[in-house]
Amino acid sequence: MIPVAEFKQFTEQQPAFKVLKPWWDVLAEYLTVAMLMIGVFGCTLQVTQDKIICLPSHESRENSSEAPCQQLLPQGISEQIGGLRELSGLKNNLDLQQYSFINQLCYETALHWYAKYFPYLVVIHTLIFMVCTSFWFKFPGTSSKIEHFISILGKCFDSPWTTRALSEVSGENHKGPAAGRATVTTVTTVGTGTGKVGEGEKEKVLIEPEKVVTEPPAVTLLDKKEGEQAKALFEKVKKFRVHVEEGDILYSMYIRQTVLKVCKFFAILVYNLVYVEKISFLVACRVETSEITGYASFCCNHTKAHLFSKLAFCYISFVCVYGITCLYTLYWLFHRPLKEYSFRSVREETGMNDIPDVRNDFAFMLHLIDQYDSLYSKRFAVFLSEVSESRLKQLNLNHEWTPDKLRQKLQRNARGRLELSLCMLPGLPDTVFELSEVEALRLEAICDISFPPGLSQLVNLQELSLLHSPARLPFSSQIFLRDRLKVICVKFEELREVPLWVFGLRGLEELHLEGLFPPEMARGATLESLRELKQLKVLSLRSNAGKVPASVTDVAGHLQRLSLHNDGARLLALNSLKKLAVLRELELVACGLERIPHAIFSLGALQELDLKDNHLRSIEEILSFQHCRKLVILRLWHNQIAYVPEHVRKLRSLEQLYLSHNKLETLPAQLGQCFGLRLLDVSHNGLRSLPPELGLLQSLQHLALSYNALESLPDELFFCHKLRTLLLGYNHLTQFSPHVAALQALSRLELKGNRLEALPEELGDCKGLKKSGLLVEDTLYEGLPAEVREKMEEE
């Protein structure tokens, strides 16, 4: 016996693979099982029963030319009915071994090969059919993709997010009709995900409305774990799509195995139809065995001929049906564009218009899935939709960022407003809009922000920062923010990415923009019109502009502070500055300036000027600052200024002068005539001495001389009795004057990094100077008298 279980490895496949088997493959599979049973049954009979039984022929030698067994054929019987002889039996004088020998010899020589090997051929051909059908499920290059696809498909089908997404869309589509019914509640079927309700369910709702209303819909429940699983599914689908759409090995393999089955079908059909008649019940056998048996002619009976002929015709019938399925498969493969798959019907049904069409092997597998159940493709499409993914991300964000967690991040910013700062999130949590106490919202590196209508709940919002965070603002929210928002900071790689709605916030007081102009637009430096910003007082622009944007003049009547940071790009045209009549503060930082622009001298209301980090070498134009009668703060730091001209004495109103990080070696004596000066910073230069005239600065409160080459200080310096901060660190001082006792207001003194051997005892007379305000080496401090140290350490 041949156990059928031995053939399981050819027929058994993973149950999950059934989703990739269309009806013709299923039919072909059953046909192969039937053909295999025919072959196994025939082989079993062939092995367990006698194959052939032979008897010697007693014909005369005169009739030796006639075929043996002729008299046993049906036509012989009909012709010789009248001439039958009555026989009482013949003795052959053969023993059992001779009969067995003759049977085997005639089986091998006289019986046609088709009759001998028919059942084996059936088994072999059927196994080849099975291998061809399941080869792409076993071949490593295709099976890995199929297994991965089926794994993802099953998870997508069973995911609670699929049901929720389809149900939400269904609810939106039926929202209108349902809203008009006061007594009928629509129930969404979770199992199918289609959002349709059967007639029986509708009747139940009509009969028991109270019961339906009290039960919350299951589709609205999605816990955090399920949300994370759905998020992982989206990533898997994306990577799988990119991987599978690259080639068409699955499509090609399926075509090849189908073509091979068709060719084999024709070959089997032809030779079976030709040789099936070779299966006969009586077989004439002529062998030269007269010396052994005494006979050379035998008449043999093929015992299974009758059964084999019936099995052969049955097998041919199954093969014909099998071949028809293969031909239909070829028609289906070449008649339809199987390398392209459109989700058009799914988009129309679900309303998810962003579901993309797919191609190559991905499309082919989806076509096969549709032959099994189109619901699989519909539910799988949910994970191809970016809208669906964004909804899921939003839901996960809301789970992760609860209102209590967001409140823990609230803190006061530099402007004193209660600020919520969020950085590098996949989206903006809806729970943000539940914090009505938020006054400032800072969003950094958050992709594709879309402000919902819930923005109107932030009634105290006055400041908004968008740092590399593109944001869409609906019209209703624009109206809400138009008169409410006071400060907005926007930062992008390029300024053209700045949302246009920013320039329509008419209540805005401060606008901070950061981003580069494209190289072809940098020279023109065109900025959106600022005419709508009627309340704008502060404008900050960090870019690579070649000139001051012309739109700055749109706010010339009320702009009070302008800051231009050019990141080293040279600012060539500044004529637009002349129109800023009420400008109080001007910053031109890293603008590549080599001279002080003349346009600045036209700003009569200017109070503060910052020219930090430019290429200024000479400041002879400083004389023209006398036209800026209100100028009180001048910052010329981080340049290459080698000297200060004597005209500095003309700046009578100047209160703060910053000249640090330059190349100064001396200071003019005329600097002492700036009697209103309160702060002077000349640190990080190359000063070797100070003019005694600095003692005339009776209003001076802060003097920074650190990181120079000073070897001594003029005694006149200690006439500045209002001096509170004196920074002398990292110079070449060898001694410190005892006249420091005259500085009664001194509260901070830096002497670290000099060549001092001792500190004067008079430091104890500086009533405002404490140990915390004295920056000096520990050894020098310990060298002070104990009573001086005790006095300085008193609270």
UniProtKB/Swiss-Prot annotation:
Keyword line: Cell membrane, Disulfide bond, Endoplasmic reticulum, Glycoprotein, Ion channel, Ion transport, Leucine-rich repeat, Lysosome, Membrane, Repeat, Transmembrane, Transmembrane helix, Transport
GO cellular component: cytoplasm; endoplasmic reticulum membrane; lysosomal membrane; monoatomic ion channel complex; plasma membrane
Gene: Lrrc8e
Superkingdom, taxonomy of origin: Eukaryota
Stretches assigned to the Extracellular side: 44-116, 286-312
Protein name as it appears in the record: Volume-regulated anion channel subunit LRRC8E
MF GO annotations: volume-sensitive anion channel activity
Keyword Phosphoprotein: no
Note on domains (UniProt): The volume-regulated anion channel (VRAC) channel forms a trimer of dimers, with symmetry mismatch between the pore-forming domain and the cytosolic LRR repeats, a topology similar to gap junction proteins.
Biological role: Non-essential component of the volume-regulated anion channel (VRAC, also named VSOAC channel), an anion channel required to maintain a constant cell volume in response to extracellular or intracellular osmotic changes. The VRAC channel conducts iodide better than chloride and can also conduct organic osmolytes like taurine. Mediates efflux of amino acids, such as aspartate, in response to osmotic stress. The VRAC channel also mediates transport of immunoreactive cyclic dinucleotide GMP-AMP (2'-3'-cGAMP), an immune messenger produced in response to DNA virus in the cytosol.
Pfam families for this protein: LRR_1, LRR_8, Pannexin_like
Catalytic activity: chloride(in) = chloride(out); iodide(out) = iodide(in); taurine(out) = taurine(in); 2',3'-cGAMP(out) = 2',3'-cGAMP(in)
Species assigned in the record: Rattus norvegicus (Rat)
Presence of the UniProt keyword Zinc in the record: no
One GO term (biological process): intracellular signal transduction
